[in-house]
């Protein structure tokens, strides 16, 4: 009997070691995907801030990978751009060479997006066929792949909003596009964190997990508000801090009717709400840090709480600097990068309260 138990124990240990090797491979893969997604969001931000998003007026999922290669092809691409309101109303004096500078941002954004589809789908297929993906993770990963495909349609849906009447894309569709990118990012982060070893430190308080969830969700909401700010060019509405045009609450926040539409279409109101959201997020991470340091100092949870507070503080400082300098490109991109770092860490922090995925073994499955 003892020999049988020893054999069973050895078999389980062998399976666990094998799963640990597979998990390391999956973490490396998902980490690379996260890095690519981070770059994609930054290039997307640059595309928006340089007003390049409408430079490619057709959706060519396959042969759109190849850019114009001759003067005639550039002339044809430029001719298509000349048909839309953005050129006719804002850029009518633009030359082909000037057009190229905005074309390359949008082309790079689409190319990276296609590349991410490849570096996600092909390894997923390989890991699946070779049995390296645990059963519990198969369909969640397929779900992320499906969200990626949907994101491609959302991207074109966003671009199409600026091709007929508007001179820019809809801020609603822009926000949807960015939030979807963040959800895909969060899904990859959640699974990668679950595949990583966790400490055995107890949670600081009963409310810690709920507070971690609230911080992650609110960070995503702040990103949504930031997308509205970008879509409406609301960063140029008030370029003072901490007051807005000399007041704590400006007088022209509710000038549009019905009043609720101001929260989505009045640039000044949108910036005001984004500021309030930043203060709220700062308060949440401060409360989270104080609770962790008081109830569970020197634990992994406390260290994460301190780091999260530091990240939000730096991000707030970058936001203020970007505002005061009237949104220069590099600072705007730094602010967007900071938002994704804060959100990614908030998701990882939240996932940290659930522990590592239990190992799957044939013994456990039979039991």
UniProtKB/Swiss-Prot annotation:
Q: Which residues bind heme?
A: 274, 335
Q: Which key words are in the record? A: Cell membrane, Heme biosynthesis, Iron, Membrane, Metal-binding, Oxidoreductase, Transmembrane, Transmembrane helix
User: What InterPro entries does UniProt report for this protein, alphabetically?
Assistant: COX15/CtaA_fam, HemeA_Synthase_type2
Q: What are its GO cellular component terms?
A: plasma membrane
Q: EC no.? A: 1.17.99.9
Matches recorded under Pfam families: COX15-CtaA
Pathway(s) served:
Porphyrin-containing compound metabolism; heme A biosynthesis; heme A from heme O: step 1/1
MF GO annotations: metal ion binding; oxidoreductase activity, acting on NAD(P)H, heme protein as acceptor
Q: What does this protein do?
A: Catalyzes the conversion of heme O to heme A by two successive hydroxylations of the methyl group at C8. The first hydroxylation forms heme I, the second hydroxylation results in an unstable dihydroxymethyl group, which spontaneously dehydrates, resulting in the formyl group of heme A.
* PANTHER family registered for this protein in UniProt: CYTOCHROME C OXIDASE ASSEMBLY PROTEIN COX15, CYTOCHROME C OXIDASE ASSEMBLY PROTEIN COX15 HOMOLOG
What is the protein name for this chain?
Answer: Heme A synthase
Q: Which organism is it from?
A: Rhizobium etli (strain ATCC 51251 / DSM 11541 / JCM 21823 / NBRC 15573 / CFN 42)
